[in-house]
Design a protein with these regions (language model features):
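Short glycine/proline-enriched turns and hinge-like loops at secondary-structure junctions
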Residues: 54-56, 109-110, 140-141, 159
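A structural signal for short, well-ordered beta-strand segments and their strand-loop junctions
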Residues: 10, 44, 97-100, 148
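Catalytic beta-strand/loop cores that center a nucleophilic Ser/Cys/Thr
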Residues: 139-160
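A structure-centric signal for secondary-structure junctions around beta-strands
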Residues: 5, 39, 58, 93, ...
């Protein structure tokens, strides 16, 4: 008898826009599961296009980047539903990995800092230096690399 699959929910925030993000996320998940011999159950939720939100039965939640302004959607149905879901996940202590646009929306919603348009867009692969020692980051090198291609930034962190 095999072990239960790892349940992974991906919240697709691309709103149908052409992108490489979803393909890369699928490839990384499949490569990871194949290398480690883990069975996975992967479900994609079209959050912006169809207001689809996963339940809380998953082991891993990834919420993607996406196009557009994280400032202009606060009253749109998908955004209201998404931020209520984020509040619920926080209340039940379920971690969610937020990528770019998703992180910016969470920062705006929880007032974690000022979300604003950058003066110029930077594109490239940049080094990231780990400052926190936590089990979550085990296996990462002290310096790892991330893709940089955003138009918005979070500044002036709200420490309260």
């Amino acid at each position: 008898m095999g072990s239960a699959p790892i349940k992974i929910a991906v919240l697709d925030m691309y709103d149908g826009a052409p992108n490489m993000g979803m393909r890369c996320i699928r490839n990384i998940i499949n490569e990871w599961s194949n290398l480690r011999g883990h069975k996975i159950e992967l479900n994609i939720y079209d959050t912006r296009g169809n207001c689809k939100i996963p339940d809380n039965s998953y082991d891993i939640y990834l919420s993607t980047g996406g196009p557009g302004s994280p400032l202009d959607s606060a009253t749109e149905q998908w955004d209201v539903q998404y931020t209520k879901w984020l509040e619920h996940m926080l209340a039940i202590h379920k971690p969610v990995f937020l990528i770019c646009h998703s992180f910016q929306i969470a920062c705006r919603h929880f007032d974690l800092g000022k979300v604003c348009l950058r003066k110029s867009r930077q594109i490239g692969v940049l080094p990231v230096h780990s400052l926190i020692e936590d089990e979550l980051f085990n296996g990462l090198e002290e310096t790892f690399y991330a893709m940089e291609s955003r138009s918005y930034q979070i500044i002036a962190p709200n420490d309260e």
